[in-house]
Amino acid sequence: MVVHPNEKQFCQLILTKPTVENVATIGQYQLTQPRLKGINLLEQSDLPILYGGGRDFMFGELNSELEQAEHATTNSPPQMILSDLFVLNTCVLIWFQDWERSLQIPYRNIMYHAIRKIDDRHLTEGHRLELMIAIERDPIINELFPLPNVSKANNFTGTGSYLQETTLSSVELILRPKYANFDRHYNVEVEDLFTFKEFGLNRGDTMVKNCHNAILTCMDFYPEEEPTNQQCTQPHSTTTEISAMPDIGHLQNVYVNSGTADDLDGDSTMDIYAQDGFDASMALQFYADQPLAGQKHRV
């Protein structure tokens, strides 16, 4: 599940479900593993790190105008699948409970994600938000969410070719919590991954916000791809401006020093670099009731 951040990937269907045995929560990782400076987080942990997620999401595709008209005509609600969401540092996993399979979504394939307010006045407090994720289409996504039928689109809008062109690139998926913030619900199995200690109240609208923030954090691990030619020209101008700046020794009120601020030389030495009438000095203040040396205590 660990991949190089610059590799191009596609969505996959896998049989792996994250558990306490094959993933580590972010809180557990921070307590047990030291942070190594200068080393990518993806290379520091042998196990994928769980940043967020939750149980009992209703997963499906955001209905287009055509699909909404079809559902209204046939009086059939849109198909939703009961699933669990896992936001890992390597990818986003959506576990389908009935299929016992996971949809693995690379972060580079996520075009945008947002919190969407459900347009239903009958919903209770704490159950009015859903998570929306727009991802690029690939063979797996096209198999799970086929493109709209062009013939039906022609009958509905008269512009089927345009509709097909605008829906080729991405698909918008929604994850709606099954339960509200304070609904009384007991899990079939004991929850040992999304515990209250690690993720707090992880249900309803709060769970949607937690998942959105977790995806936002993990997407920072995967920066944008190489810039275009227009963007590449900008660093050259910056480099030219930096090279045109005068030498640091010619600036006023600047002293050349390669030490640790404990080797300031006298005026006779510094006059070689700057003759502007200013003297170098350092002010230190010590308190009588505080020792200069102490001990570190781990809390």
UniProtKB/Swiss-Prot annotation:
Q: Which UniProt keywords apply?
A: Cytoplasm, Nucleus
GO cellular component terms, semicolon-separated: cytoplasm; nucleus
Pfam family example for this protein? Voldacs
Taking the first listed entry, what is the main subcellular location of this protein, grouped into a coarse class? cytoplasm
Which superkingdom is the protein from? Eukaryota
Q: Where in the cell is it found?
A: Cytoplasm; Nucleus
Query: Which pairs are disulfide-linked?
Result: none
Identify its protein family: Belongs to the LOT5 family.
Q: What is this protein called?
A: Protein LOT5
Organism, scientific name: Kluyveromyces lactis (strain ATCC 8585 / CBS 2359 / DSM 70799 / NBRC 1267 / NRRL Y-1140 / WM37)
Lineage, opening ranks: Eukaryota, Fungi, Dikarya, Ascomycota, Saccharomycotina
Gene that produces this protein: LOT5
